[in-house]
């Protein structure tokens, strides 16, 4: 699949600490026909001086808003919900039972998965969880300490029924 198309909007993050470079960049053109794993992307704007291997480029054009409501997550061996969108997100009115990993996993990973960006403007409320640590936040960074990655996350009015 093509990761970038002309006109797409891109944010740039440091691979070491997940900090975001200022600005949103617009794809001008791409060359995907290199070796099935390399893409050359040209931007309309001038990029700041950088070593490309130290940064990841996230195409934010198709990042969705997320609403998960009225669902039951039961007997799932992995996580219930994995959220990595920077758009509006709301998870409410759900029941989580016997989920093997975190019920809700808020990730940001520039080390292994590459498509995982930070969460912004998220609400988690009025859910019922069956374990005491149901929500996991994990920016996976190469350096410590970790800078703020996720922002404006509100967690309230949930029930934890062990």
Tell me what each language-model feature is.
Residues 59-65, 73-75, 82-85, 96-97, ...:
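Low-complexity, polar/charged sequence tracts that form flexible coils or short amphipathic helices
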Residues 95-132:
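Long amphipathic alpha-helical scaffold regions
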Residues 54-58, 78-80, 110-115, 139-145:
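Short, recurring structural edge motifs at helix starts
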Residues 1-34:
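Ser/Thr/Gly-rich low-complexity blocks that favor extended beta-strand/coil architectures
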Residues 12-24, 44-60:
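C-terminal effector modules of nucleic-acid-centric enzymes and ribosome-associated factors
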Residues 77-84, 100-107, 131-137, 162:
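Short glycine/acidic-rich loop motifs that flank beta-strands on beta-rich extracellular proteins
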